[in-house]
Every structure is written in C-alpha cells, then in structure tokens.
Amino acid sequence: MSKKSKIIELFLTVGIVVGLGACNNEVATDEVSPANAEEISAEGGEGGEGEEYSEGEQANADFKDKLAGEELLSALQQGGHVIYFRHAQTERDYADQVKADVNNCSTQRVLSEIGWQQAKTIGEAFQGKEIPVGKVISSEYCRAWQTADLAFGQYEKNSDLNFLPFEDYTDEQVAQMKENVTPLLIEQPESGENTVIVGHDDIFESATGIYPDPQGMAYVLKPDGSGNFELIANMLPDEWSKL
C-alpha cells in the first residue's frame, strides 16, 4: 500500500479511537498511566523532518510491498523474519535525542493514549493471527520499550537501537548508527520464529535509506543468512489485524 493511502487510513483510525474515548468517557487504568495529551503533529520528526520530502521520506512513500494479505501472513507464520517497528504514537513529535536521559522517562517523548492502544492492537493481532515471536528487542527509550511491552509482554533493551545524541547527524554519525543496527537486521531468527525490533526512524533510515513514517509503522525484513536482508512489506498498526 502506498504511503498516501496508509496515512489516510491511519488518521481515520485515530479519529475513531479519539471519538470512542470521548463517547465512553473512559479513564485509562494501566499500571503505568499513559500521557493524557492526544496531540498529533504534522511537522517535525525525531530527526527533524521538514515540509518537503527528504530522500528517506520519498523512499518510504514509494515503497511497494513484495507480499501482502494472506501471502504475507503465511510467510510470517512460518517465521524467519525480522519485524522492525518504529515505536507507537507519542504525545508530540519532536527530536529529543540531545537532552533525553534514557533512564528518565520524564525527559523524553512519551506514548500518548493512542500510542498505548496502537501497541495493544498490534499485540492482539499477532496473537490472533498466530504470528510466532521469538526475541523482542527495543531501544532504551521509554516509548520504544513500552511499545514492545504493551504489544508483546517482553523486551530486551539494546543501546545499539538508540539515537546518537546529536541534533544534526554527520555522514560519519549516520554510518555509525548503520553499523550499530545492521547486525540486528541481518541476524536470522530461531527456526519458526520472528524477531521483533522496536526502535526509531533515523536508526532504520541509516541502514535502509527509508524513513519509516508515521509512528507505529513496521517494516518486515527477511535476512538471507549471508549478511544481507530483503525488505518485504510495511505495515501500519491497524493493518496487522486485517492480514
């Protein structure tokens, strides 16, 4: 599905979630309370996306799924894939990598209530569709490991998925992020399992040239066992239940 179609579908879904919450006047009762703000910003990504498409954003918009629907589901049920999620929706979308303390959630962007629901919806879809999950790896940022925990009930933090603490990256810093994350993308999962990674936009772009947008988007990769991988599909949070 094209990025334009996915964006339209995402915002329709967000509108439904907000509307239902308002009608039901529900109060979240999770063990760790999600943030109350529901702001969705159209500008400014974690790495500072602008009004015009960058090369990475254009690559995301132009990406064509190699497998979709029942074919994709069947492939995932057999295992052997790495599924890289950009964390679920946050309160606001801005770059926080310079000042954020990964050990203190109050210094970071945090998941909104929509983000919490997105993560839970993803996890329910994986269970309902019987998509086997082995390792679940997240960055050390709260929005990443909370997405992983809400969706899959487990995670191991890995600093190789963290941002480098700079507002604007040099070519050398982008290369360093690529060197950090690539081993996770090319590692073949255990037989019959899929590896889930929950990270960030710039990290994925450094290794693939694709800026994963919007938040909550996932890319399905197939490691070939020879140090490379193939990009198979991208998925919005609500698309998993439709496979």
Predicted regions: what they are:
Residues 1-11:
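Bacterial N-terminal signal peptides that target proteins for export
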Residues 12-16:
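Hydrophobic helical h-region of N-terminal Sec-dependent signal peptides
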Residues 18-22:
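C-terminal motif of bacterial Sec signal peptides marking the signal peptidase cleavage site
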Residues 24-26:
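Bacterial signal peptide processing site
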Residues 31-64:
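Post-signal peptide N-terminal segment of mature Sec-exported envelope proteins
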Residues 55-159, 164-167, 210-243:
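Active-site-proximal alpha-helix that buttresses catalytic centers in soluble enzyme cores
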Residues 82, 190-199:
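Generic beta-sheet signal
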Residues 160-171, 178, 185:
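All-alpha RGS (Regulator of G-protein Signaling) helical domain and cognate RGS-like helical scaffolds
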